[in-house]
Amino acid sequence: MMLTIALSKGKMLDLTLEVFRRAGYAMGSFSTASRRLVFPCPEIGMTFLIVRPTDVPTYVEYGAVDVGIVGKDVLMEQDSDVYEPLDLGFGACRIAVAALKGQASRDRLSSKIRVATKYPKITERYFNQRGVAVEIIKLYGSIELAPLVGLADRIVDLVETGNTLKAHNLVEVECIAQSTARLVVNRASLKLKHAEVTELITKLRAVSRVATGSRATAPCEPSRGVRRTGKRTRT
């Protein structure tokens, strides 16, 4: 049976294709230079769809596709009802809280603070767990600008190297979670196409172990303690 797979467009796409090729899937008809969004590959029993990363869980949950490849950050934010059997190991980033340099340790968490982010649900859960009242400002890009123009006290964003934060005079206050590419499966497809899905998981897991063992990770840094008191935790 043919598997339909949603791939995240953007910089994760090339890494995803490389993993599939290492797993032995010949994708001759696939071209990232094409404007096409649907790529049938009958020679390997798969059809690929190129979609926005934030749409991948929706396509999978509602059965428009059988399988998807998407970052853990998107899954945490959307909390979709999908089966997540495999961490592919690439695309390592971290979801982090950041603030202007010199203001990171300022005692401003005793009252309501503004936080700009494209991850409102993750942000709300994080600060609620710490008893900090927040006003969340949803942005769709260039999150680093928010503290520079006084729009927000903090930001929650995806960080890979930290260079973008440094370029905007921001420092990482605390890491919320790590994010890597994940394989997710529609729950009905897992039953109806069990053999095909299991074979895909097995092959990708084999090459992902190699990749995971040698990849440059983006680990969570030691916590600086975002707390109501605004004090840092000693390390």
Task: Please identify what each model-predicted range represents.
Residues M1-T235:
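Domain-level signature for soluble enzymes in the chorismate/prephenate branch of the shikimate pathway
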